[in-house]
Regions:
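Basic amphipathic alpha-helical segments that dock to polyanions
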Residues: 45-50
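Beta-hairpin "wing" of winged helix-turn-helix
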Residues: 54-62, 66-67
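C-terminal regulatory/oligomerization modules of transcriptional regulators
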Residues: 76, 92-141
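Short amphipathic alpha-helical interface segments
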Residues: 10-22
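Key DNA-contact positions within bacterial/archaeal DNA-binding proteins
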Residues: 40
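A short alpha-helical element within helix-turn-helix/winged-helix DNA-binding domains
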Residues: 26-36
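The C-terminal cap of the DNA-recognition helix in HTH/winged-HTH DNA-binding domains
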Residues: 19-22, 33, 51
Length: 141
């Protein structure tokens, strides 16, 4: 199982945005500089986040992005879904009768990996952007 840079960077950028969201809109350029993420890549990610109503853009000289909801209402699952990031620990499809080995039955460890995927998804369902901001603030003190 591997999260791609798209998913990891989306979360990093949104934690950065959430830290400054109460002050003014935050520019992608500022996030790019603080987090070391390519501006072009951030633009692609934020287009998806905007389309899925996680963020909204503010135009003008002091423009940038703001969260569309409170940070405590945005779960990691929402972010990953918005950028088309899927957590998948098994190769076979959930409803398929064929297993990940291409045979008619599931592999011997299928249930283990399926259970792990459920635990990971439950963790992401429970963890909010606010949790990550608080966690980051506590470690910096």
């Amino acid at each position: 199982m591997k999260l791609t840079s798209k998913g990891r960077y989306a979360v990093m950028a949104l934690v950065d945005l959430a830290r400054f969201d109460n002050i003014n809109p935050v520019s992608l350029r500022d996030i790019s500089l603080r987090q070391g993420i390519s501006l072009d890549y951030l633009e692609q990610i934020f287009a998806k986040l905007r389309k899925n109503e996680i963020v909204q853009s503010v135009r003008g000289t002091q423009g940038g992005y703001v969260l569309n909801k409170k940070a405590k209402e945005i779960k990691l699952t929402n972010i990953f879904n918005a950028v088309d990031e899927k957590v998948k620990t098994v190769q076979c499809k959930k409803d398929s009768k064929k297993g990940c080995n291409g045979k008619a039955t599931k592999c011997l460890t299928h249930n283990l990996w399926d259970e792990l995927e459920n635990h990971i998804n439950n963790f992401f369902d429970e963890k909010s952007l606010e949790d990550l901001v608080k966690d980051n603030s506590e470690k910096r003190v």
